[in-house]
Amino acid sequence: KLKKPVYLGFLDFRQLSQRKHFCEQEVVLNQRLSHDIYQGIVEIRETDDGHFSLQGSGRVVEYAVKMRQLPDAAGLKALLQEGAIDPKRMETLAHTMADFYKGGHRNSDIDYFGRPDIVSYNMEENFRQLDPYVGSLLDQEKWEFLCQVSRTFLDHHRDVFERRVREGHIRDGHGDLRADHVYFHPGPQIIDCIEFNDRFRYGDAAVDLAFLYMDLEHLGHPEWARFFISAYAGAAQDPQLYTVIDFYAAYRAVVRLKVDAFRYPDAQPAAQETLKQDIDAYLQQAYRYAIQFGRPTLWILCGLPATGKSLVAEALSDVLSIERFSSDRLRKAAGISGNGRRTAFGQGAYRMEWRQKVYTQLLAHGHETLKAGHSVILDATFSRRKCRDEARRLAADLDTNLIFAETVCNEETIRSRLKNREGTS
C-alpha cells in the first residue's frame, strides 16, 4: 500500500522521509485493532537500469505498507447486504471497542480534544467550509436548523463534555470507524485508522462510535446501529454515551457530506448525480439527529413504592447531568409527609387531593425546566392514567421527547423493603 507524494493541508506526504514515517505509523496504529493484517513496511528499490523491486539492490525510491488482504465477503458492509450479521458478532465488535478505549492511550494533550471549546472549533470549521454550498447543494432551512441546534446543544451541555474529559473518555482512537473498515475474519478486524493527523484520531470515544452508528443507519440498518451502541454502552459501562451520541452522529454525517461536497464541482455529470443523492441523504440524517438532540427530554420514572424508582431516577440524573424532581420531596417540602412514620399508599399524604396537588407541582417544575430548553426527570408513581396523560400533554405542548421508564420487582422484595422502611421510621 503506497502513499502518494501529496500535500492537502491536513496531511503532508511530499518527502520520502515523511512517507516512510507515516507508513510506520499506519502499521503500529492499525495493529491495535487487527491481528496479523499489517505485516510491516517494505522498501521499493530502483536499479540503475530502471528496474523496480521489493528486494535486492538499488536505491530506495519508495516505501509501502505490507498487508495481508482480507476477503471482501468478510467485510461488515458485505455481511449486512447478505443478511449475515447476527447479535453475537455485533456484541463481539462492541466489546472489542470497549476494551480498546479502556486500554487506549490518554494524556493531557489528548484530553484537550474533548474540551467543549475544541469540539466547538471542529464543528464550526465544518460549518464554515460548507457555507458556500448552502442554497445550492445544501437545503438552506435544514442546514440553518442543524447549525443552530448544534451550537445550542453544545452550549447547554458544556458540563457533560467537561465531565467526559474528567472521567477519561477522551482517547487516541481510530478516527475513521465505518463499515468499510470493519471485517470479521474470524473475529473483528478493524483497519485503516487515521495515521496522518493526530487531531483526527484524538477525541471522545463517542466520536468514533458515532461514525459507525451513523454509517450503519446510512446503509439502511438502524436496528444494528442501535444494537451496537446499546451493546457498547453496557460493555463500557457508559450510559452517558446516549447524551452525546446523536450530536456526534450529526457531526460525522456533516463530515461525510463535506467530503462529497468538495468532490462535486470536479465530478462528471453522472457522478455528480450520485454525489448529490449522497449529500441529500447525509444532510437528512444530520437534520434528523439534530431534531432528536435539539429537543429536551421529559423522563417519567414511574412504578410502585419500593420498586427502586427513586434510586434509578437519582442514578439517571447523575449520569445524564439533568435535574430530577421527586414527588416524595415535594410532599415533605409541603409538610404533608405525616408524622415520620410510614404512611400507607393511598392514605395520608398519598390521599387523592394531596396527590393531585403534588402532581400539579411536579408537572409545573417539569414545564419550567423543559421550557428553558433542559431535560428533566419526574420521579413519582404515576399510577393513574390521568397523571400519565398530563405528562404526555406536557411533552406534546412543548414538543419534547418523552420517555416512560417503569421500575418493577417481585412482590416479596417490595414487602421486604416496605417492612424495612417501617422499621427505620
Description of each model-found segment:
Residues 1-174, 179-255:
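Conserved ATP-binding subdomain of kinase catalytic cores across diverse folds
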Residues 169, 293-299, 372-374:
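Pre-Walker A (Motif I) flank of P-loop NTPase domains
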Residues 258-301:
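ATP/Mg2+ or Mg2+-diphosphate-binding catalytic cores
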Residues 309:
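Conserved lysine of the Walker
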Residues 317-374, 416:
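Conserved substrate/cofactor phosphate-moiety recognition/catalytic segment
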